[in-house]
Amino acid sequence: LARNPNYWGKPPVLKSVTFRFMPDPLAASNALLAGELDAYPSFPEREILGRFADAPELRVIRGSFPFKAILALNNGRRPFNDVRVRQAIAYAIDRKALLQAVSDGDGTVLQSHMAPNDPDYAPLPDRYPYNPERARELLKSAGVQPGTQVRLSFPPIGYARDTSELIAAYLEQVGIIVTLQPLEWPAWLSRVFGQGAFDMTVIAHTEPHDIGIYDRDTIYFHYHNPAFHDLFQRYEASSAPATRHALSVSMQSQLAQDEPNVFLYSVPRDTVMNRHIRGLWTDQQIAACPLADVYWAP
């Protein structure tokens, strides 16, 4: 990208910026260490960050962003169309231990589909504390037999792989046998997100304030609830901040009750950059990488 000399507003400091698309985090870390990359916002593999500890020209800055990791359940398929099964799966997973495993406990266990950096985030009580016995009771009441087999698909990114492996172990303890299905991004986007052809999947939604996806008829996890629809329509129709906030909290509570997906955790955002770079976003409210205020400091 080159600076536009005819831009009407404040001119950016940098003359040009080159974006490099590097899907392999290890290769990206090598490029950062070699000085071939100057910055990597939202570095995806936390276990690699230690490589930068002794790099004098680099710094790692931890910030916030609307990261919401979920175990998405296909509400249009049996047995996930039964709320008791979805709640049982939530009880079967120790989400605090999960957060500890994937991020050394740095983050927040989620109770609904909203990240802590959202102004409307509601710190709801934990409706589904780790309780394998309660999970077995709910599965039995829903007619789910021990040994029931399901498939858990996940895209090629570290948190999804690690989380999926741990969830498979937790569900096996309550009688659900999980087959792990790793997918490359094109296959995941086509089969899971596009066609809704899956049982369960681990994915992080990083769009800000995207709770409205639960009111979409075409959403990949096939959740439909008239009560949530009514709340969202009232939210959309209101312009009063207090009313919208109250309705947002109600929507979060409704999702926590229905548990269309198992809400797992939100973790911070790590940005790796040259120590002389200034002005790059480290906290991210929206999915953007503004460059107008970025500059090199001595």
What is each residue range found by the language model?
Residues 14-16, 34, 66-111, 138, ...:
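Alpha-helical secondary-structure segments
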Residues 26-37, 54-55, 83-84, 165-174, ...:
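Short helices/loops that flank or line small-molecule/ion binding pockets
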Residues 59-73, 117, 225-231:
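Periplasmic-binding protein-like
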Residues 3, 92-122, 159-168, 186-298:
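Detector for C-terminal structural segments
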